Amino acid sequence: MGRAFYIGRFQPYHYGHQSVLKRIAETADEIIIGIGSAQLSHEVNNPFTAGERVLMITRALAHLDCPYYVIPIEDIQRNALWVAHVRSMTPPFDRVYSSNPLVVRLFAEVGISVESPSMYERETHCGTAIRELMLNGEPWEDRVPPAVVSVIREIDGVERLQQIAGSD
């Protein structure tokens, strides 16, 4: 079974991520969840801090029947070194789950097994669509687990996103 690695920006964490992690939990002994672009926040495409994303994921997965670690991973500007950077920040793992073509390629080049899970209702359950709903003041809460709704409300996440998207 082994230890699996799954990386995403989780801006915000949503049911698409939840679906993939539940499937990974069926075959893994442990899961490492990497919060990619951890240094980014307070931007339209990256409104939430790494700590806020840790909170979203941890609360949403409270009942997951598989041990997991949530680890923020900052970007580096050299793709050829990125896998080594990830490995230096995480416990060892033997399997990667990602649908990102660059992530798939980089891990495959160093001989790590990569699986590309299909995303749950990708068109509606993606961070871009959810942030767009938030920006437009439209309902978004049905796209994320209730625990994530609570975190976003607790941090005034929608107001933050709308404010940073405003123009002077």
From Swiss-Prot:
GO terms for cellular component: cytoplasm. CDD domains: NMNAT_Archaea. It is an enzyme of class 2 (transferase). SUPFAM superfamilies: Nucleotidylyl transferase. Its EC number is 2.7.7.1. PANTHER family: BIFUNCTIONAL NMN ADENYLYLTRANSFERASE_NUDIX HYDROLASE (PTHR21342:SF0), PHOSPHOPANTETHEINE ADENYLYLTRANSFERASE (PTHR21342). This is Nicotinamide-nucleotide adenylyltransferase.
